[in-house]
């Protein structure tokens, strides 16, 4: 049973979040995978390396024979059982290897012998990857409106609430600043790009999309970088700037970086370890900008952070964090953002408070 797919078929797979049983080795999967893929490899990393060496030294027939020798008996049966269970759990899914070659065909034939007929991606991960790249290039050509504003302006929430918005920071699992990490590890660059492409395809498919609403991001979001085709279009885009009162920004930052992050860490690790992780998270964020703050100012703010953490631990109040957060915003983040915005002042087409910008975007 062999499936042939056109470019539109590949896009449909991504739009539908079709479950993909990816039979490549874990090392390949970690380097790049599709969003709805699960990794159930035909060969583990060591087995794949051994077969690859054999192929180079003795040719394809010897490599194939070695592969069958390595994945035999109980190991083979365990893997068939895992694939069979995944197929039954995901009846609308599809098999995938690197290029739609021997590995996915072997798994498909073994499943057929076990009573399961399951399609495969002709062209494999490589074809899906090329589809993702091409889709991003094409979709990035649509007009873009960027949401700008100082830290704590609620830009991400505003983007999330737009039907034509794509939350780049959410996809990157990072909020873009020194304090931007989340509890989820960031994806590999290729996996991030694949996820972004799938999200853009789904957003475009849900509506007659005329323009994108994105947050005004730099090239890097944590360890991930935006695809060059999208980044180039963003440098030409119109910008709507959120200008909320300082006190409202502080409330948002308190909720996002202190209350929510403390909750998330304790939920993930338990009270004691979660508290330690939360403290390390805040100190790591401050330490990341030590050079720009200067050693003396950094030491002062770090001491105020320690005091605030002690107060939070003993009383539950996060108010003490204002002692270091306010000067950090006024002396570092706000001047830095204003400097960046000045360089693209001609792109700014609207300014207003959060609700005003949201209404303006909605009317586009």
From Swiss-Prot:
Example of a GO biological process term: tRNA wobble uridine modification
Catalytic site positions: 97
InterPro entries assigned to the protein according to its UniProt record, in alphabetical order: Rhodanese-like_dom, Rhodanese-like_dom_sf, SelU
EC number(s) per entry: 2.9.1.3
UniProt catalytic activity: 5-methylaminomethyl-2-thiouridine(34) in tRNA + selenophosphate + (2E)-geranyl diphosphate + H2O + H(+) = 5-methylaminomethyl-2-selenouridine(34) in tRNA + (2E)-thiogeraniol + phosphate + diphosphate; 5-methylaminomethyl-2-thiouridine(34) in tRNA + (2E)-geranyl diphosphate = 5-methylaminomethyl-S-(2E)-geranyl-thiouridine(34) in tRNA + diphosphate; 5-methylaminomethyl-S-(2E)-geranyl-thiouridine(34) in tRNA + selenophosphate + H(+) = 5-methylaminomethyl-2-(Se-phospho)selenouridine(34) in tRNA + (2E)-thiogeraniol; 5-methylaminomethyl-2-(Se-phospho)selenouridine(34) in tRNA + H2O = 5-methylaminomethyl-2-selenouridine(34) in tRNA + phosphate
CDD domains in UniProt: RHOD_YbbB
A Pfam family annotated for this UniProt entry: Rhodanese
GO molecular function, one term: transferase activity, transferring alkyl or aryl (other than methyl) groups
Assembly behavior: Monomer.
Annotated family: Belongs to the SelU family.
PANTHER family: TRNA 2-SELENOURIDINE SYNTHASE
Identification of the protein by name: tRNA 2-selenouridine synthase
Protein source organism: Shigella boydii serotype 18 (strain CDC 3083-94 / BS512)
């Amino acid at each position: 049973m062999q499936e042939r797919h056109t470019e539109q078929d590949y896009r449909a797979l991504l739009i539908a979040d079709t479950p993909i049983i990816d039979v490549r080795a874990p090392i390949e999967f970690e380097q790049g995978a599709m969003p709805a893929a699960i990794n159930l490899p035909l060969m583990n990393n060591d087995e794949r390396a051994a077969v690859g060496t054999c192929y180079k030294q003795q040719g394809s027939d010897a490599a194939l024979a070695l592969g069958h020798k390595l994945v035999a008996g109980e190991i083979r049966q365990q893997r068939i059982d895992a694939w069979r269970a995944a197929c039954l759990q995901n009846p609308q899914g599809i098999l995938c290897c690197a290029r739609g070659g021997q590995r996915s065909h072997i798994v498909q034939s073994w499943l057929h012998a076990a009573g399961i007929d399951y399609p495969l991606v002709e062209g494999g991960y490589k074809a899906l990857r090329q589809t993702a790249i091409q889709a991003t290039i094409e979709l990035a050509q649509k007009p873009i409106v960027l949401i700008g504003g100082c830290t704590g302006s609620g830009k991400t929430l505003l983007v999330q609430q737009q039907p034509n918005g794509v939350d780049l920071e959410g996809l990157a699992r990072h909020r873009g600043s020194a304090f931007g990490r989340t509890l989820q590890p960031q994806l590999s660059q290729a996996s991030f790009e694949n996820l972004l492409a799938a999200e853009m395809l789904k957003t475009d498919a849900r509506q007659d999309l005329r323009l994108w609403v994105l947050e005004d991001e730099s090239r890097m979001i944590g360890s991930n970088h935006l695809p060059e085709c999208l980044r180039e279009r963003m440098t030409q885009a119109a910008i709507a700037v959120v200008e909320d009162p300082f006190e409202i920004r502080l409330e948002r930052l308190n909720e996002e970086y202190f209350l929510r992050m403390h909750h998330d860490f304790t939920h993930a690790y338990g009270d004691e370890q979660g508290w330690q992780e939360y403290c390390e998270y805040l100190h790591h964020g401050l330490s990341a900008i030590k050079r720009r703050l200067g050693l003396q100012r950094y030491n002062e703010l770090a001491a105020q952070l320690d005091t605030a953490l002690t107060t939070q631990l003993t009383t539950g109040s996060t108010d003490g964090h204002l002692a270091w957060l306010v000067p950090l915003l006024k002396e570092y983040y706000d001047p830095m953002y204003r400097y960046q915005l000045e360089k693209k002042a001609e792109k700014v087409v609207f300014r207003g408070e959060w609700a005003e910008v949201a209404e303006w975007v909605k009317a586009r």
